[in-house]
Amino acid sequence: MAAVINRAFGAEIAADISSYTDVSQSAWYYNDMAVAVNMQTFEGDGSGHLYPENYITREEVFSVLARALVYETDDFSSLNKFADNAQISQWAKEYLSALAQRGYISGDENSNVNPQANITREEFAQLMHNIFKTYISLPSAYSYVNDDSVMINSSGATLVNVTVNGDVVIGDGVGFNPVS
């Protein structure tokens, strides 16, 4: 998950994660975990663990994405529409609520968000599509984008006469280079 989020947002700068006892420097995912910690999408459990080899739950993924997008709220009323809202961990409510308020998560046919279930690749791909209808990764001029949120992860990208009704997210990979 860290690798996918880092690449999607173009994040490259790593933090010192030597205080996390479950991430070996020789592990293939070490740098991705360090970048995710620096990006503040991965926070650990407060006792020195990131659990990099565990499956990731739906509420954990929702939280990672909301932190990456800096979506915050203290209004949890949007969680009331989920039949299983009592299963949402207290620490995750802010993040799930922020995504639900924006319509990015809506629950299944039974109005369940299944926060404790492991997320599948298909569910993750759908969530990313729900958030970013347009993903720009090449330097070029774009005269059409879907009217929802747009992720720009390339310097030199230019939006020409476009209206975006959602968010325009400039990925870390753009750095200080121009986007217009």
Segments (PLM) and residue ranges:
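Alpha-helix C-terminal capping/helix-coil junction sites
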Residues: 37-38, 100
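Short, T/G/N/S-enriched strand-turn elements that build extracellular solenoid repeat scaffolds
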Residues: 136-180
